[in-house]
């Protein structure tokens, strides 16, 4: 051992070949075919085949290490903020008008935005076009960005005009409530890349997407969804909406689902399975352009609240609710309030036995001239229809209701028609 130290101390020996040889000795046994000799006090490997073998093994080791690294790398987008950190929504700058989920490589001259879930660099983001375009990528060809919770993902980003979801993997997501809520300038969105097989909550998903004029929701699997509260509420620009493919068999809450969709002129909900719905408050309230609505398939046996169901639908002339079962409904507050053009209404099948609040039920239904009711019809408060001093109401026998009466007769099945006071005086 001392001789080796002395030799190293006294001889001019190149260290690299020695290190290489020692490394080879430890990692790979030197091949029997590899010959070495000294030249000018340097150790030389004579057999070139050995160096090629070493280099190939070294490459394999590096490849294996890279494979292990990639295997352990996750490609998951951060959602909820960790302590002292920001979530993805917070990292979307106000300058961004477009977000693109992609697999392309980040340009070297662009700064990295940390959007990775666990900080291993599997997902990166950067800005282009002076901050107008935000790209989010795994930088691995074909590798999608995984996300397990889409709740409020783009919420409140008023300047976004387009979102490309092509490389976003949502197969594990159970929450999409408020996903696009408040994207007031969003003009187009392709939902075909979304996997919603596991989603249970879509409440407020498109709420206040005021600039959307069309929306194809045929790609959405809603078979597990239980909550559709305000799902399309205040989508003021939507001119049409086809929801015929929706599986609503598990939905319990449809409160204000289409409320204030002010450009919708017709809505067909006949395919909806509402057998588990308990709350329909404001379902189509303030759909002010709505002229036609189909509710023929509705099963309302479990519904307890129909408050403001049709309120503010000022262009509806007819409403067919003959399929409704209201045996469990307690709240009908403002149910038809503001239906200014409604001329006839058949409530003969409506069960009023459990209704405790019917106030303002017919408020501002100024065109209503015929009302048909069943044997359980009653009112807990004064009826707006009977407050107009210019008109009176007659029953099917032609008998006028007393002038001082502000309620229709209780528990009497009948059809009432409105006539001007001057007509009755002339008679």
Regions found by a protein language model. Name each.
Residues 30-427:
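Negatively charged
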């Amino acid at each position: 051992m001392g001789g080796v130290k002395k030799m190293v101390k006294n001889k001019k020996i190149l260290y690299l070949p020695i290190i290489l040889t020692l490394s080879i000795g430890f990692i790979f046994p030197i091949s029997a075919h590899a010959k070495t000799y000294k030249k000018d006090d340097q150790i030389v490997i004579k057999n070139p085949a050995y160096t090629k073998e070493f280099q190939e093994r070294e490459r394999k080791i590096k490849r294996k290490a890279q494979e292990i690294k990639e295997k352990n790398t996750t490609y998951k987008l951060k959602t909820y903020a960790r302590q002292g950190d920001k979530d993805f929504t917070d990292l979307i700058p106000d300058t961004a008008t477009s977000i693109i989920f992609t697999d392309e490589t980040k340009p070297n001259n662009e700064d990295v935005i940390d959007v990775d879930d666990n900080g291993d660099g599997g997902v990166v983001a950067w800005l282009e076009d002076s901050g107008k375009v935000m790209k989010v990528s795994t930088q691995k060809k074909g590798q999608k960005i995984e996300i397990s919770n889409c709740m409020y993902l783009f919420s409140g980003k008023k300047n976004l005009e387009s979102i490309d979801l092509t490389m976003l993997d949502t197969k594990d997501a159970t929450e999409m409530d408020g996903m696009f809520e408040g994207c007031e300038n969003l003009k187009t969105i392709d939902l075909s890349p979304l996997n919603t097989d596991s989603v249970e909550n879509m409440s407020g998903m498109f709420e206040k997407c005021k600039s959307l004029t069309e929306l194809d929701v045929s790609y959405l699997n809603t078979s597990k969804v239980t909550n559709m509260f305000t799902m399309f509420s205040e989508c003021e620009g939507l001119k049409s909406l086809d929801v015929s493919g929706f599986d609503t068999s598990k939905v319990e809450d449809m409160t204000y689902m289409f409320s204030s969709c002010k450009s919708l002129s017709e809505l067909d909900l006949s395919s909806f399975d509402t057998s588990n719905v308990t709350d329909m408050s404001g379902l189509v309230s303030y759909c002010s352009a709505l002229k036609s609505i189909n509710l023929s398939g509705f099963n309302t046996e479990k519904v307890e609240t129909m408050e403001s169901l049709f309120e503010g639908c000022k262009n509806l002339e007819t409403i067919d609710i003959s399929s409704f079962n209201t045996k469990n409904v307690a709240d009908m507050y403002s149910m038809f309030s503001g239906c200014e053009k409604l001329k006839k209404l058949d409530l003969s099948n409506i069960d009023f036995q459990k209704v405790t609040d019917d106030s303002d039920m017919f408020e501002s239904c100024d065109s209503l001239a015929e009302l048909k009711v069943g044997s359980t019809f009653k009112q807990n408060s004064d009826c707006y229809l009977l407050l107009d001093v210019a008109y009176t109401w007659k029953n099917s026998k032609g008998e006028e209701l007393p002038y001082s009466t502000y309620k229709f007769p209780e528990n009497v099945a009948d059809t009432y028609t409105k006539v001007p006071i001057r007509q009755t005086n002339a008679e």
